[in-house]
């Protein structure tokens, strides 16, 4: 099989997401004290926090087993998505880009968790006293990837409906 005709060439996007995330986290850890916050806009701070759980600090208050669980989960999901990329055609650009972003984000957070025992988060959006959960570049990559997959699914559904009519 010619691998250039699969979704695997899109893995460069995973590498960009992975390294962008790790570089930004390194900059935060080197230049901020824990919980230090710098106001950027009236609704946005850079705030260094440590997330021992998953999205929205899910399971953060447990005894430490969740670190290994989330690392294994990220690896398993990444390998599954890698298989999807292998099976996809290179022409499935939206889906392949979404998958690649999700792999890069998942592996970046897993690497952070394996190295530190937690994930470094720093994007802090808020309105008055309400704060959205703090997140990082890897989280953005995962969410954009999931959004691209949703858009692709709707587009595929529209194509099927138009063929039936």
UniProtKB/Swiss-Prot annotation:
Catalytic activity: Release of signal peptides from bacterial membrane prolipoproteins. Hydrolyzes -Xaa-Yaa-Zaa-|-(S,diacylglyceryl)Cys-, in which Xaa is hydrophobic (preferably Leu), and Yaa (Ala or Ser) and Zaa (Gly or Ala) have small, neutral side chains
GO biological process: proteolysis
Gene Ontology cellular-component terms listed: plasma membrane
Localization per record: Cell inner membrane
Protein's membrane topology: Multi-pass membrane protein
Active site residues of this protein: 121, 139
Enzyme Commission code: 3.4.23.36
Keyword list, A-Z: Aspartyl protease, Cell inner membrane, Cell membrane, Hydrolase, Membrane, Protease, Transmembrane, Transmembrane helix
Entry similarity comment: Belongs to the peptidase A8 family.
Name of this protein: Lipoprotein signal peptidase
